[in-house]
Amino acid sequence: MPGPQGAGGAPAMNLGKLSPVGWVSSSQGKKRLTADMISPPLGDFRHTMHVGRGGDVFGDTSFLSNHGGGSGSTHRSPRGFLAKKLQLVRRVGAPPRRMASPPAPSPAPPAISPIIKNAISLPQLNQAAYDSLVVGKLSFDRSPASSTDGHSAYGLDSGFCTISRLPRPEKPRDRDRDSSFPAEPELRRSDSLLSFRLDLDLGPSLLTELLGAMSLSEGSAAETPAPAPAASPPASVANPPAPASSPSLRGRCPNGVTTRLGPVAEARASVVGEGPRAPADEGPGKHRGAVSGGSQSRHHYTEVDARAEGLGALSQARASWGSLDEEWGASQAGSRTPVPSTVQANTFEFADAEEDDEVKV
């Protein structure tokens, strides 16, 4: 079984130093500690074991117990590891000691300890692994320029590495500092939300439509043209249907039949005898105007116009029917339906009032 130094021509390790008996019995076995044998402070890292470059081992070395191809037991004490090495020394034989001559200086140790190099439980940290880690920040400590052989005693070459941690008070500060930058855009976003207005157009309301219909009815009543004068009988004779189509004779036909203006207007329409009785109808109109009060006061102008239109239509009807009697003859006059010579002005007045009341409701 090869020694701990391997069979690659490396200088043989003095296994006598591994025995605590050799340290006590040999006066020259005492070895001074040097700077390269003690690691520098590593922060939170606990220095629980030490493996020197010359083979000095102390501390918890249980992770090295299965090194060397032994049994598969993973839990071995350092004493068992040292006892195994002592048995190997007894079999091979220890080199003779030279008591007279001073001890020769030990050869230069290798750059990387073979025990640490071949330890399978130690992680190998490199720059690629550092880039992939997010939780912690890894940094490798280089050895100071104390070694004279040009090789660093610690660091990547010696296998020692340091996982440095940020102090706990610094982490919240960094978070607060990082979180303070996006605070300004958030305030801007809130200002834009406060200045945002939502305007919805739901169309015209029912009240707007009612007011529009009432204004149209009032405008049409005010824009009604004045009736033609009664002193134009030739024009009415030349064109007999003109009185029926005129807006002043709304609701009447040449044969004397009155069109339906509504249930109320139809019930109030009646046929009266000849003779101007328009002044007799002014009483009911005035009475209805007095009863209606302020709601019918705005229709006063419409009622006056209706009365004037009724008087004008009466004169035109007399002239038109007189000319028709002369043209058609006595035979046609006998079969013709009697036509009233008087038009009640209040009929149109009540019809307009009822239409306005229906719009108001």
From Swiss-Prot:
Cellular compartments per GO CC: cytoplasm; cytoskeleton; endomembrane system; plasma membrane
Composition bias, Acidic residues: 351-361
Residues modified as Phosphothreonine: T34
GO biological process, one term: positive regulation of pseudopodium assembly
Record InterPro entries: Cdc42_effect-like, Cdc42_Effector_BORG/CEP, CRIB_dom
GO MF term set: small GTPase binding
Location of Omega-N-methylarginine modifications: R53
Biased composition (Basic and acidic residues): 167-186
Sorted UniProt keywords: Cell shape, Cytoplasm, Cytoskeleton, Membrane, Methylation, Phosphoprotein, Repeat
Phosphoserine sites (modified residues): 19, 27, 39, 65, 73, 77, 101, 113, 121, 139, 180, 190, 192, 195, 270, 320, 323
Database matches in PANTHER family: CDC42 EFFECTOR PROTEIN 1, CDC42 EFFECTOR PROTEIN BORG
Free-text note on domains in this protein's UniProt record: The CRIB domain mediates interaction with CDC42.
Protein family: Belongs to the BORG/CEP family.
Function as written in the Swiss-Prot or TrEMBL entry: Probably involved in the organization of the actin cytoskeleton. Induced membrane extensions in fibroblasts.
Protein's name in the database: Cdc42 effector protein 1
Gene that specifies this protein: CDC42EP1
